[in-house]
């Protein structure tokens, strides 16, 4: 893994994502970390008064931009001091909205991984508010860092799987080569509240071993009707450091409604979620 992109908004949420990335970089072959700040001022903000009936002038907007540039430069220098000389830290400001800014940097810089923080209960950050849209629209892998998450070396990871999408387990092939830090024991968790797996365990196990033969892995089952609760309960009881979400409409992540994903991310206060692409 050569390059990590982290969108920032100077909140506690993004600060924790940066700290996690810093600690992660000690276990990974990271060469560059890019900090991205969106400074988008809509036409309406430029022509309409604020709630205090103040009209923003071009000078006001430029002053705010300079302040943000100063904050971002300081944040970049602080990160560089923590990472040392082996990792290049780059800062960039975009005049585009967050989603478009992220997409443009991905197109220009080709990062291997996008790291974003999810908000703690009671906190609302600009990045955290858009985390679902960011995760779904990103063309590169996304690592979501809960507000209370502290980096631990990834030794065990759970991969929730609906066997309608069993072929997507093949995306795990080679992941341990492209991400030097990611070579855990895999727990493939078949989320099956309707108990369709009963009597077909051997068939499913053979399919898993064929598709995920580059990892030490084992197949487990969850019959909890609350899919998210079943996954998090399993992870909490098995010393897991990471949840890996497969892409596609049968993924546990993408198959949830917007509100369900929000609830899941809020409930999951500890474990990072890696969303494959």
Residue ranges and their predicted role:
Residues 1-16, 112-171, 267-277:
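Intrinsically disordered or low-complexity boundary/linker segments at protein termini
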Residues 128-130, 173, 202-205, 257-262:
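Charged helix-capping and loop-helix junction motifs
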Residues 55-70:
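A short acidic, glycine-rich active-site loop
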Residues 37, 118, 190, 246-248, ...:
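Short secondary-structure boundary segments
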Residues 26, 107-108, 136, 180, ...:
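Solvent-exposed polar/charged
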Residues 40, 77-114, 213-243, 247-261, ...:
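Structural beta-alpha unit
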Residues 1-56, 156-221, 240, 268:
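Small/aliphatic-rich secondary-structure junction motif
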